[in-house]
Design a protein with these regions (language model features):
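Non-globular targeting/processing and membrane-anchoring segments
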Residues: 1-92
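Short active-site neighborhood of thiol/selenol oxidoreductases, capturing the structured segment around
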Residues: 86-113
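Short, intrinsically disordered, charge-balanced linker/junction segments flanking boundaries
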Residues: 115-119
Length: 119
C-alpha cells in the first residue's frame, strides 16, 4: 500500500467533516465517506474491499448477536480500567454495546455520533 500524502490526509479530513455534517442516515454517511476515501486513496479502498471479502468468505460475524438479541455474559474494562460485568450494568437498565477502535477511525466516529449526538 502506498503512503498518504499530507494533502490527501487533509482531503480525507474534509471529506469526513462533510459526511459527519450531512443530513442523512448513518448508512448514507458511511457510504459517502467510503466513496470519498476511495477517490482520495484508492489503495486503501482496495485493501478494505479485500478484507471485507475475506471476512465474509470466512463467515466473519455469522455468530455475532444481532440487534435485539441477548448478549452472552462478559466483562470489559470501564473508562478507569476496572472490569465491569454486563449483568451489573443491566441492573441499571438497558445497555448498548458499541465497538470503537479509536479516534483515528472515521467509520467508528460516525457510528458513535449516530448513537450519541454531539459526540
Amino acid at each position: 500500500m502506498t503512503s498518504l500524502s499530507p494533502a490527501d490526509a487533509e482531503r480525507l479530513k474534509l471529506a469526513f467533516q462533510r459526511c459527519r455534517d450531512m443530513d442523512g442516515t448513518l448508512n448514507e454517511q458511511l457510504r459517502a465517506y467510503a466513496n470519498a476515501s476511495r477517490d482520495v486513496f484508492p489503495a486503501y479502498g482496495e485493501a478494505v474491499d479485500r478484507l471485507v471479502t475475506r471476512l465474509n468468505g470466512g463467515g466473519g460475524g455469522d455468530t455475532a448477536p444481532r440487534p435485539g438479541d441477548a448478549m452472552p455474559s462478559f466483562m470489559l474494562p470501564d473508562e478507569s480500567g476496572r472490569l465491569v460485568a454486563l449483568s451489573s450494568l443491566l441492573e441499571s437498565g438497558p445497555v448498548a454495546v458499541m465497538f470503537f477502535r479509536g479516534h483515528w477511525c472515521p467509520y467508528c466516529r460516525l457510528n458513535v455520533r449516530a448513537v450519541v449526538p454531539g459526540a
